[in-house]
Amino acid sequence: MQRRGALFGMPGGSGGRKMAAGDIGELLVPHMPTIRVPRSGDRVYKNECAFSYDSPNSEGGLYVCMNTFLAFGREHVERHFRKTGQSVYMHLKRHVREKVRGASGGALPKRRNSKIFLDLDTDDDLNSDDYEYEDEAKLVIFPDHYEIALPNIEELPALVTIACDAVLSSKSPYRKQDPDTWENELPVSKYANNLTQLDNGVRIPPSGWKCARCDLRENLWLNLTDGSVLCGKWFFDSSGGNGHALEHYRDMGYPLAVKLGTITPDGADVYSFQEEEPVLDPHLAKHLAHFGIDMLHMHGTENGLQDNDIKLRVSEWEVIQESGTKLKPMYGPGYTGLKNLGNSCYLSSVMQAIFSIPEFQRAYVGNLPRIFDYSPLDPTQDFNTQMTKLGHGLLSGQYSKPPVKSELIEQVMKEEHKPQQNGISPRMFKAFVSKSHPEFSSNRQQDAQEFFLHLVNLVERNRIGSENPSDVFRFLVEERIQCCQTRKVRYTERVDYLMQLPVAMEAATNKDELIAYELTRREAEANRRPLPELVRAKIPFSACLQAFSEPENVDDFWSSALQAKSAGVKTSRFASFPEYLVVQIKKFTFGLDWVPKKFDVSIDMPDLLDINHLRARGLQPGEEELPDISPPIVIPDDSKDRLMNQLIDPSDIDESSVMQLAEMGFPLEACRKAVYFTGNMGAEVAFNWIIVHMEEPDFAEPLTMPGYGGAASAGASVFGASGLDNQPPEEIVAIITSMGFQRNQAIQALRATNNNLERALDWIFSHPEFEEDSDFVIEMENNANANIISEAKPEGPRVKDGSGTYELFAFISHMGTSTMSGHYICHIKKEGRWVIYNDHKVCASERPPKDLGYMYFYRRIPS
């Protein structure tokens, strides 16, 4: 039976008031225009508050606005009422109780509310055999908190009844988003339901596979009809092979094959030769069991790697997660975990580290009232609001309370159970920060380092006034390139947010052990014997730091002194030191087969780090600078005709490509220019533009484009005229110089063609003999300076320079063979002790594996 108790007390107010039957219709009349029935495109948030992690399971329940369908906890619903004037909310409450035990001790079947069933997608485990729940819904009218119990068909207007039913039966907005997160959804094979499988006694071993017709041990496919193991071919697998699986299909006609090494409890890569495309096999577990493969106990070995590669890393998982030790759970402010949404541990680890930094705490949680009060009408789509919500959830301690013995006894006596919070769910945060990114918006595992840069980019773009907490990571890198032939040098600076440290494998201190282990491992694999105990390479941190500072060769370096390509050498130094230094260990690389591989190494990362010796010194006495001349770009004739068509409206720039480039560490404005000047042809093409132009002085300056007017008359410029007769507008000059031509070329070409961009380009291509006329250039520059008001010099990059001495306070570790798989956890030093954050589990760390980390966070030691 539905519980009809009074509404929990509102903030600073009394409990709810119940209405007499005759008053309900009259009370709702003034609010009817604001009550809506959810349409198909509306998102109904009835699982989680927009400002907090309150849910229907929370003590105060959840309030769903009957106009916007946003949800608010008890502490935040008044804010929404004051801001919007919306008065009618649906209050949802789920009561969880311990099940009544039968005479034999078994739990009785779960009871549900006979009138109300909320289709809630909460993260609490309410399907346990020990608990049952009862759902309650009512309409609440603000500001007097009048309550109308639901359902109430007899007394409510028809529109209100329809709206309430639609809200109660609506699906979670995150479920609606799920289909969009998967690209290229595969069709179900028409052969899967009635697939013939031969009873030939074939049993497939868990490892040691080999093509039945050649010696290949990778890219192997198991035919699901006869159990043949044969190699694939590049056109449907993209990793090479001799095509024996396809030949077998042509000979026998058996249509389906599964790629060995991709089988997991969640599925596998299945290909249909008959349908000529990857497909889904809904009966895959049954088809694999026919050949002795237990799909539920298989672990994927990505891209054809052997299962032994996974077994070798068992010790890595155990060490990083501190398995085998009894870890003490931590509760309270700063000790709240994040639930895993399915491959979301990369996000959880980064956010735990981010919100352990005081500058981020102050910028978001410290400004919580202001950010929440001035949030847009839909706070679920506001970055600063969702950052503040997440930060408060992690730091407040509100969702990390230890169980109290007296409360447990009282709950047992009342047969009621209040679920202990096992962390908060970052669903709303992840949905927003990943929606514009093709990778992070998927449900696949991602690289924590890439997400860190993605987050920094979002912080930069959504800065709160003059406050930008990501400034603590920003530093300047000085790159010195020397032409080996002329010995002349060029110094440039760029902005970066993390230090990428190479793994100096050649400096391993246990080389003899590694060689012996590798020989033993190969012999064991060949003879199918148990693998030897893992021997991990031990790399001195000093060797990695030395590898970072050593000069590197620059292939195809264009020397402006020679006006030709030459050998070059590049060295990198810190032009400034950040307040917080993030160090990424470059553990991941690609093998000869382009398969991602991970260096399984142990590096003695220091607790105290001094990199003052890496401070940049700039141009040294006796050094001669390379001339400031850009390399020419050769554009084929057929490209000239398309050049003008590639220029797009700046408002149509592909922001996803811009963000992908920005996450590589390039300035945001440079990324926008790269995407613009390559005609929205994708991040890869834009990246090539960046490589060519990154040394130009205006590389990071904002993209400024002239407006396009109506059709120009013959011989007239398509751009607006400048204040000086026939003086080329700076915007047009910038377009041409961004294509690699010299400034004086651009100016003379535009003057010769009356500032017509297309004709100016043709003029440049038809005058290859053009040489710089210094008198002409000087005269023109003087005229330009006399007639054009120069803008103020743009503010330089914001950096917080200081000493290069640091102490370690957090690190993120990765377990697995690739950034696209495995698991991430985070260790943070708080209150003088290390704490392990493993998704929703937060415990005191006994043996923090500082030598196995992937990303390290250092804070500056005040000098």
Curated annotation (Swiss-Prot):
It is found in: Cytoplasm. Residues 652-693, 727-767 form the UBA domain. It catalyses: Thiol-dependent hydrolysis of ester, thioester, amide, peptide and isopeptide bonds formed by the C-terminal Gly of ubiquitin (a 76-residue protein attached to proteins as an intracellular targeting signal). The modification Phosphothreonine is found at residue 122. Gene3D superfamilies: Cysteine proteinases, DNA helicase RuvA subunit, C-terminal domain, Zinc/RING finger domain, C3HC4 (zinc finger). It comes from the Eukaryota. SMART domains: UBA, ZnF_UBP. Keywords: Autophagy, Cytoplasm, Hydrolase, Isopeptide bond, Metal-binding, Phosphoprotein, Protease, Repeat, Thiol protease, Ubl conjugation, Ubl conjugation pathway, Zinc, Zinc-finger. One of its GO terms (molecular function) is cysteine-type endopeptidase activity. Highly expressed in ovary and testes. A zinc finger (UBP-type) spans 187-295. One of its GO terms (cellular component) is cytosol. Changing residue 233 to A: Does not abolish ability to stabilize SIAH2. Phosphorylated by AURKB at Ser-114; leading to stabilization of cell cycle proteins such as SKP2 and AURKB, but not MCL1. Its EC number is 3.4.19.12. Deubiquitinase that mediates deubiquitination of target proteins such as BECN1, MITF, SKP2 and USP10 and is involved in various processes such as autophagy, endoplasmic reticulum-associated degradation (ERAD), cell cycle progression or DNA damage response. Component of a regulatory loop that controls autophagy and p53/TP53 levels: mediates deubiquitination of BECN1, a key regulator of autophagy, leading to stabilize the PIK3C3/VPS34-containing complexes. Alternatively, forms with NEDD4 a deubiquitination complex, which subsequently stabilizes VPS34 to promote autophagy. This is Ubiquitin carboxyl-terminal hydrolase 13. It comes from Homo sapiens (Human).
